[in-house]
Amino acid sequence: MRRHNFSYSKCSLFLLAINLLFACKKEENTTNFDNNKVNLVIADNFNLSVFNAALRVSNMDKELQKGEGPYTLLAPSDNAFGKAGYPTVVSMLSERAAIVSNIANYHILDGKYELNKLPFLFNQELKTRRGKVYATHWVKGADTVLTLNGARILTQNLPASNGLIQVLDRVMTPYVHDKIVDAINADASISIFARAIKRTGILSEKTNQGAYTVFAPNNAAMTLLGFQSVQDVELANLDDLKKLVRYHILHDRRFVYDYILSTGNTNMSKQTMLDGNSVDIKLVPNTSSPGSFSGITLRGLGNTNDVLLQKQDILTGDGVLHIVDQGLRLTQ
């Protein structure tokens, strides 16, 4: 009888030991789970819900959770995604996976980038998982401003256990074309100006050295300049055509926000173009945020009305393309 009781006691102790072992392992697993990884910080922020959806669709959330990093996430706000055509989480979840993957990976840097520690310079090149981005660190009045591809950083250096998060006011688009001339040729709305570029050879392989910014007149604007079709471009005087084209190009990479940062208290500045002549740049006040600016207008030496940007900040491997609603005129 005593041996029977002893057997029961041994059995009970064994089961107790097993339960304690599993309890310890469960507690250990719970303790080791890191809920402060960059993807989980994103998931906990209600203002970054669409970007969180992009990470999930692209499976980048799993990689960021497993990875030691460090990573820097360039997270557009929900408002930024709304402006880019993704107003809700559902709209992102219903997008094609390949497009979402491009968006997500273009907003991820391998490494820890405290952008506020960059030199005070314009358009410093950084490499994301889907291509280059250009960071500007500058002082405007009393504010120190950070931008990426012309998108302003709203909140910087949000900490996570395996990296940092920078919150942007705009979704950045991965560039498709290495050459700005290819981006011009690909847009049907500027096909007449594209033919002028081709005929003059100004952005050809031989002449295209360094970065360029192009303010390309749309087809309606080219019509007002006397070019109703590509045939008119072919028949035009070549020297006159070169003057026209050069007055729409500058030798530098310039996003719209670069002008906002570099323009002084008068809210007006001048931009020297490829032909040596200048274009007036005027800042457009942001009516919903007094003291800030929403964009720019241009005016050539011969323009009597402001030239407006229809599309802006189209990044290529060697420059930036903007599309304008009027041609820049040298004379009236």
Segments the model singles out, each with a brief description of its role:
Residues 2-6, 11, 24-332:
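Mature, structured domains of secreted/extracytosolic soluble proteins
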Residues 17-18:
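Processing junctions and N-termini across compartments
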